[in-house]
Regions:
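...with weaker cross-activation on analogous glycine-rich loops/strands in unrelated enzymes
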Residues: 142-206, 211-212
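Conserved beta-strand-loop surface patch within small alpha/beta domains used
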Residues: 1-65, 71-103
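Surface-exposed patches in mature extracellular/periplasmic domains of secreted proteins
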Residues: 136-141
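Second-shell loop/turn segments in exported
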Residues: 110-115
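Active-site nucleophilic cysteine motif
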Residues: 116-132
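Glycine- and charge-enriched low-complexity intrinsically disordered segments
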Residues: 209-247
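Extended, compositionally biased flexible segments
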Residues: 58-74, 205-206, 210-221
Length: 247
């Protein structure tokens, strides 16, 4: 554990049951934690920083992360957290249950423009799992790899912690592999439950839609991560809710 992380955890303990808040700042002397005062009217439920604290942190160096805690709460960013994180364009570090969870500032899961290898179906899958607390590797992938004798999903899923489950056992958070104009599975979608999936296909914005007969016919197999737990879907749901109310 770094000195910065120790300072973050100590500050959260001192503030509990209220939420702590602060910044990780990169200074000429190295990375340090800059604690702030939570000026929220409901500090046990929300956090709010003063503009003065934000300015003082910026004067110390480059802000590299915003930090807050969920005392007795859940280790995923809330709907409000995700909305504010995207606005801040910063990584957010969350203190919960004596640990620090670090979240990259990924775009909202819905409404993304498609760019192969940058914001495509695998990026959406990877970012959704990141918000759920599971890290998936990034890797280079040429466009149309499925037409060049490659089978990237089937060749890599087991090595990254997933295993195949029967389609009849589908649970929210499972990954659907589909054949989209291909003889091999070349498209990943997140099953959301209630007959819905979350995915990103070329020339469209990422979206939730019904898991219709069309997509059921295209489905090759269903996969689940070994570290997955049902409550992890909360992290994905919170982002979907944040995006639906984002103005």
């Amino acid at each position: 554990m770094t000195e910065t992380e120790s300072a973050i955890l100590a500050h959260a303990r001192r503030c509990a049951p209220a939420e702590s808040c602060g910044f990780v700042v990169r200074t000429p002397e190295g990375e340090r934690y800059f604690p702030c005062v939570n000026i929220s009217g409901e500090p046990e439920a929300y956090f709010r920083m003063s503009p003065e604290d934000w300015l003082q942190a910026e004067m110390q160096g480059e802000i590299v992360a915003l930090v807050h805690s969920h005392p007795g709460g859940l280790p995923w960013l809330s709907e409000a957290d995700r909305r504010l994180q995207v606005q801040s364009d910063l990584p957010w570090w969350l203190v919960c249950r004596g640990a620090i969870y670090k979240f990259r500032c990924v775009p909202h899961l819905t409404g993304r423009r498609f760019e192969h290898g940058v914001t495509d179906c695998y990026t959406l899958f990877r970012d959704a799992y990141h918000l759920a607390g599971i890290e998936m590797p990034d890797f280079h992938r040429e466009d149309d790899w499925w037409r060049n004798g490659q089978n990237l999903y089937l060749d890599n899923l087991e090595a990254t912690g997933l295993y195949q489950v029967p389609l009849s056992a589908a649970q929210p958070g499972d990954v659907l592999l589909c054949c989209f104009g291909s003889s091999v599975p070349n498209h990943a979608a997140i099953y959301c439950g209630d007959g819905e999936l979350l995915h990103h296909i070329p020339e469209q914005l990422s979206k939730r839609e019904r898991y219709t007969d069309k997509w059921q016919r295209r489905t090759h197999s269903l996969w689940r991560h070994r570290a997955w737990r049902a409550s992890a879907f909360t992290g994905i749901c919170n982002d979907l809710a944040a995006a639906s109310t984002f103005v």
